[in-house]
UniProtKB/Swiss-Prot annotation:
This is Glycerol-3-phosphate dehydrogenase [NAD(+)] 2. InterPro entries: 6-PGluconate_DH-like_C_sf, 6PGD_dom2, G3P_DH_NAD-dep, G3P_DH_NAD-dep_C, G3P_DH_NAD-dep_euk, G3P_DH_NAD-dep_N, NAD(P)-bd_dom_sf. GO terms for molecular function: glycerol-3-phosphate dehydrogenase (NAD+) activity; NAD binding; protein homodimerization activity. GO terms for biological process: carbohydrate metabolic process; glycerol-3-phosphate catabolic process. Its EC number is 1.1.1.8. It is found in: Cytoplasm. GO terms for cellular component: cytosol; nucleus. The active site is at K244 (proton acceptor).
């Protein structure tokens, strides 16, 4: 395609996007206001809980005001973290110096947090999801709906699975996903950003005002400082959200080696190609345009590769020679860099399915992280990338 044709095509896309009329923020009501619960209270979990609680408080015609947030209880200088959150209205360990709404209630009991919820927002490190949903089985409303803010996959003998699909499989409830160019501290400080929510209205949808749909989800997550676009491509935003963390490790490696912005840009270019290829190969229902047009796609890739935990961990690995696991413990204050476990999961799946050679960047990140391959070998390892057509 000629450069002028590409420019015209891009202009048409942007013009169409700007002309779209957004009716999703018009008045929405519910016959019985929906109760919302958040599972997870780390840096991002607390930030999303803040967003949600602000909206439930402002929209009593649609949501019950109180939002319960499940907290894995721990002691902070001899005081339970839940007690600190509920009295000082700050998560002093994972989101310090950010005031939380008074209607956000920290709860150390997972079942009491979620048993009456109509909407459950999952926001925990994805390696803990299996243990959490196993406790919730049979303990929640059968017609509850869910949104996963997790980044990663469930890899098993039968293949690679979206975490939203895993939640649906294990709990029998419809689950969507939220992902975007969202560094938690910036959202928590109410610096303007945007995100993507993906949700497919299920076959058993009970009707407007009786069930969760795109309009309700926009009302739940959209804030003046946190703009939301709701789509139906759950696979697309989930794939992009998981794999961008692996790409970010690669960017951290070259940053730590002192190779500069050109090298980081090359990693992102290769990474975007492999993300799209992965979606096409293993989740054909995903839409290529999601990666380009949504915050959850290339925008999130750029943001994550410019900062965040995965880049920090990989940069420190390059500078110190320490393992990813050790660096994670040293600098993340109990949080996790999801790219480390995702790189291993993706490798396991690509190896079992015989596709490792088609994803040289993903494989290089795995080999450097877990097989002690020197980071300086990264350029030669990704040189033979098959371009996505």
């Amino acid at each position: 395609m000629a450069a002028t044709d590409r420019l015209n095509q891009t202009s048409d896309i942007l013009s169409h996007s700007m002309k779209k009329t957004d009716t999703s923020m018009s008045i929405v009501t519910a016959e019985n206001p929906y109760k919302v619960a958040v599972v997870g209270s780390g840096n991002w979990g607390t930030t999303i809980a803040k967003v949600v609680a602000e909206n439930t408080k402002e929209k009593p015609e649609l949501f019950q005001g109180r939002v319960d947030m499940w907290v894995f209880e721990e002691q902070i200088d001899g005081t339970p973290l839940t007690q600190i959150i509920n009295t000082k209205h700050q998560n002093v360990k994972y989101l310090p110096n950010i005031d939380l709404p008074g209607n956000l209630v920290a709860n150390p009991d997972l079942i009491s947090t979620t048993k009456d919820a109509d909407v459950i927002v999952f926001n925990v490190p994805h390696q803990f999801l299996g243990r959490i949903v196993s406790q919730m089985k049979g303990q929640i409303k059968p017609d509850a709906r869910a949104i996963s803010c997790l980044k990663g996959f469930e890899v098993g003998p039968k293949g690679v699975q979206l975490l939203s699909d895993y939640v649906t499989q294990e709990l029998g409830i419809q689950c969507g996903a939220l992902s975007g160019a969202n560094l938690a501290p910036e959202v928590a400080k109410e610096h303007w950003s945007e995100t993507t929510v993906a949700y497919q209205v299920p076959d058993d949808f009970k009707g407007e005002g009786k069930d969760i749909d795109h309009r309700v989800l926009k009302q739940l997550f959209h804030r003046p400082y946190f703009h939301v676009n709701v789509i139906d491509d759950v696979a697309g935003i989930s794939i992009a959200g998981a794999l961008k963390n692996v790409v970010a490790l690669g960017c951290g490696f070259v940053t730590g080696l002192g190779w500069g912005n050109n090298a980081a840009a090359a990693i992102q270019r290769v990474g975007l190609g492999e993300i799209i290829k992965f979606g096409r190969m293993f989740f054909p229902e995903s839409k290529v345009e999601t990666y380009y047009q949504e915050s959850a796609g290339v925008a999130d890739l750029i943001t994550t590769c410019s900062g965040g935990r995965n880049v920090r961990v990989a940069t420190e690995m390059a500078k110190t020679g320490k393992s990813g696991e050790q660096v994670e413990k040293d600098i993340l204050n109990g949080q996790s860099a999801q790219g480390l476990i995702t790189a291993k999961e993706v490798h396991q799946w690509l190896e079992s399915s015989g596709h490792t050679e088609e994803y040289p960047l993903f494989e290089a990140v795995y080999q450097i992280t877990y097989e002690n391959v020197p980071m300086k070998e990264l350029p030669s390892m990704i040189e033979e990338l098959d371009i996505v057509e």
